[in-house]
């Protein structure tokens, strides 16, 4: 792996071109993971608390899993841990998740069919560095963070990151191995390559 990230101007240019080509060709869907849980809207805040406690032993990421809310099989919103902080414990059994949910549209999202370069830009604009991935019908299918994007790019380069390094990247919410993906996309934008790519995708 270290050999791929060599030194020298020609080596650096070829690496950048390889990254750019992958960011254009790879799509969000296959790169996504599923960093969200699901609760029904009529479940109590106690259920949310218990869910967090059960996951405390293995959730070591900088950003905990999102909690999406359903009603009768329909996605209707999401809920944060803020109600657990704002309300006394005795109210957790009286109030439901649905009473404190927020619109699903508030979460930054991207379609499965979008190219990865769009994900790189969207992640920079998102508050927490995570995106909700949606299918053609606009329904949630997964999530995407920087480590997901980085892992997909490394696979495209036929490089496999050791699990401990990938987990460390996920905990920090950054690109594994310091992949300069934002710089690659910025260069593509400056050269006008993204305009040409967008036109070819819509034609």
Description of each model-found segment:
Residues 81-90:
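Structured interaction and signal-relay segments at domain junctions
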Residues 73-79, 94-97:
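Helical hairpin unit composed of two closely spaced alpha helices linked by a short loop
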Residues 38-64, 69-71, 88, 108-136, ...:
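The conserved cystathionine-beta-synthase
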Residues 24-37, 46-47, 93-107:
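Bateman (tandem CBS) regulatory domains
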Residues 8, 29, 85-86, 150:
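Nucleotide phosphate-binding site architecture
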Residues 76-82, 141-150:
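Short hydrophobic beta-strand motif reused across regulatory alpha/beta modules
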Residues 1-42, 157-187, 192:
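Membrane-interfacial segments at transmembrane helix termini in multi-pass membrane proteins
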């Amino acid at each position: 792996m270290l050999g791929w990230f060599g030194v020298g101007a020609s080596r650096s240019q070829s690496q950048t071109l390889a990254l750019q080509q992958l960011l254009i060709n790879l799509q969000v869907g296959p790169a996504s993971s599923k960093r969200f849980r699901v609760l029904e809207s009529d479940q109590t805040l106690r259920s949310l608390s218990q869910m967090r406690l059960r996951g405390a032993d293995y959730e070591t990421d900088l950003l905990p899993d999102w909690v999406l809310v359903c009603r009768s099989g329909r996605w209707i919103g999401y809920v944060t841990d803020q109600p657990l902080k704002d309300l006394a414990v005795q109210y957790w059994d009286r109030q439901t998740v649905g009473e404190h949910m927020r619109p699903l549209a508030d979460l930054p999202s991207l379609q499965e069919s979008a190219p990865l370069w769009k994900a790189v830009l969207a992640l920079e604009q998102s508050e927490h560095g995570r995106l909700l991935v949606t299918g053609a019908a606009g329904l949630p299918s997964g999530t995407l963070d920087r480590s997901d994007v980085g892992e997909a790019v490394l696979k495209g380069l036929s490089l496999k990151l050791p699990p401990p390094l990938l987990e460390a990247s996920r905990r920090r919410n950054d690109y594994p191995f310091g992949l300069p993906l934002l710089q690659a996309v910025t260069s593509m934008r400056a050269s006008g390559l993204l305009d040409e790519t967008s036109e070819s995708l819509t034609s």
